[in-house]
Amino acid sequence: MQRSLDSLAGMATSAFGAGTSAAMRQATSPKTILEYIINFFTCGGVRRKNEAQYKELIDTMADTLKSSMPDRGAPLPENIILEDMDGCRVEFNLPGENNEAEQVIVRVSKGDHSETREIPLVSFEKICRVLLFRYEFSIPQDSVMLTAQGGMNLKGAVLTGANLTAENLCGADLSGADLDGAVLFMADCDGANLKGANLSGASLGDSNLMNACLEDTIMCGATLDRANLTGANLQHASLLGCSMVECLCSGANMEHANISGATLIRADMSGATLQGATIMAADMEGAILTRANLRKASFISTNLDGADLAEANLNNTCFKDCTLTHLRT
């Protein structure tokens, strides 16, 4: 019995104290020689059983939080109880009147026996917010809740038309996600992974996308006015018809991106890499391209009136039928 309680306490600590892929693997691996032997002869039976219990813990926690909170922005309850987890009671006691410690106390009990653990409050709150976020937007719960960097795991999530205004998505994994028509106005996506995501028609005005990975993203018709894309990776991104007025793209990597039809009036693209990029019928009036790498970029029927190309790399750059009046070089 003690070993069963210890195992469940370990799972709860890993799930709600770390929430990462590494934590899940460690918590669900066989622990004893006997478990390793059984796991071998059942082709991973022990691990599968542990993974099912781990997932049940997460699903039950999500349901409990949803039923006890008016909305996901509300304070977490000081005491959260998960009943009948494999015949056990799992209790999370947050700092407050009944817990003077700065940690969340996890207590797993069955009859007269119990096991106690402690987990960081910051990690616990972050994981609970992920569960509530996924619940609100009808995204199936996942055993991996956080990335190794501590961002939300939303890989492949369907968030079409979702209102994510001012949402904290720092370091989130949104690779392959569908954000068609989503509203991310003023969202903080610093360091987020959006590789291969669909952001067509999304509203990203005034958002923070510093150092975000937007490689291979589809952003046709998206609005990025005044967005901060400093240091972002936009290699092979499709930015057809995007509105990027006064967008900050300093140091961004836009190699082989398609920026045709985009509006980049007064955009700051200083030090950006646009090597091999396709820019057709774009409006780049007053754009700042100082020290930008424009090698082999193709500018066709693009308005570059008043643009600043001082110290830009123009090796094999093509300018065809472009407006180049008042150009600064």
Question: Where are the language model's segments positioned?
Answer:
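Non-Sec secretion/translocation targeting segments of pathogen effectors
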Residues: 1-43
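N-terminal capping/linker segments that flank leucine-rich repeat
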Residues: 89-153
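Short linear elements at protein peripheries
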Residues: 50-103, 107-109
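Residue-level detector of alpha-helical secondary structure
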Residues: 9, 34, 38, 42, ...
